[in-house]
Amino acid sequence: MTDLHTDVERYLRYLSVERQLSPITLLNYQRQLEAIINFASENGLQSWQQCDVTVVRNFAVRSRRKGLGAASLALRLSALRSFFDWLVSQNELKANPAKGVSAPKAPRHLPKNIDVDDMNRLLDIDINDPLAVRDRAMLEVMYGAGLRLSELVGLDIKHLDLESGEVWVMGKGSKERRLPIGRNAVAWIEHWLDLRDLFGSEDDALFLSKLGKRISARNVQKRFAEWGIKQGLNNHVHPHKLRHSFATHMLESSGDLRGVQELLGHANLSTTQIYTHLDFQHLASVYDAAHPRAKRGK
């Protein structure tokens, strides 16, 4: 039988040399495995052969009591299962003691969205230069069609059909979809196209950086965040919030879950159903504000 640390060091070398994992990933594995080493040592274990499912379960409970979140615990147990699988492959263990141990489900975090009043304030930016026109067009398209950030930066001029008010986008899994973008988005795209040649680009991209290249996702994130601050929005404005806001506002207005699924390009309806929880939050807030029986203490 071998020392606890020795086996972990051998495993980390395997991950580095044979699996060629990045230094950051290796460091994460090391941290997770050091946690189980400390727990095992505290409980008198001298080798991994002494580790059984009860030890792993107690380790999981201890991790939770120390404040480790459900998602982080799931990652820790995943690292532990991978390590024990490797020990089994090395004939150091007969079975993986972590195989039947799972973390509790992480609580569902509903996506943040921007309400209609704040969205109107965000879109009403001061147009004082060509880049501001570009940003207004990007904001209008993002909110008007519920695009993913990757879909927005991937748009080419050839993907536009401004006469019909539609764009073609390439979504996840190389799936194309044709989307309406609304009259405001069309108007601002046309305004931007009148100025686009100022950047002297031969690139086919619809939205360009100030250097005349296709705008990057990072640049879009930075510009949207800056506009959120300038327009006085309390919460950080991230491109994905515009997509969430599009979905929420569409569902509040139409109640058509299948239609929203198609517009968002979700393969599974279950992915779209999270917005029904947001819609319920909206209805609940309306109820609490308006219904006589909800007004406690009055």
Curated annotation (Swiss-Prot):
Keywords: Cell cycle, Cell division, Chromosome partition, Cytoplasm, DNA integration, DNA recombination, DNA-binding. It holds the Pfam family Phage_int_SAM_1. CDD domains: INT_XerDC_C. The active site is at R148, K172, H240, R243, H266, Y275. One of its GO terms (cellular component) is cytoplasm. The keyword Cell cycle applies. Its main location: cytoplasm. SUPFAM superfamilies: DNA breaking-rejoining enzymes (SSF56349), lambda integrase-like, N-terminal domain (SSF47823). The keyword Transmembrane helix does not apply. One of its GO terms (biological process) is cell division. It is found in: Cytoplasm. Residues 109-288 form the Tyr recombinase domain. InterPro entries: CB, DNA_brk_join_enz, Integrase-like_cat_sf, Integrase_catalytic, Integrase_recombinase_N, Integrase_SAM-like_N, Recomb_XerC, Tyrosine_recombinase_XerC/XerD. NCBIfam families: PRK00283.1, recomb_XerC. Site-specific tyrosine recombinase, which acts by catalyzing the cutting and rejoining of the recombining DNA molecules. Binds cooperatively to specific DNA consensus sequences that are separated from XerD binding sites by a short central region, forming the heterotetrameric XerC-XerD complex that recombines DNA substrates. The complex is essential to convert dimers of the bacterial chromosome into monomers to permit their segregation at cell division. It also contributes to the segregational stability of plasmids. In the complex XerC specifically exchanges the top DNA strands. Forms a cyclic heterotetrameric complex composed of two molecules of XerC and two molecules of XerD, in which XerC interacts with XerD via its C-terminal region, XerD interacts with XerC via its C-terminal region and so on. Belongs to the 'phage' integrase family. XerC subfamily. This is Tyrosine recombinase XerC. The lineage of its organism: Bacteria, Pseudomonadati, Pseudomonadota, Gammaproteobacteria, Enterobacterales.
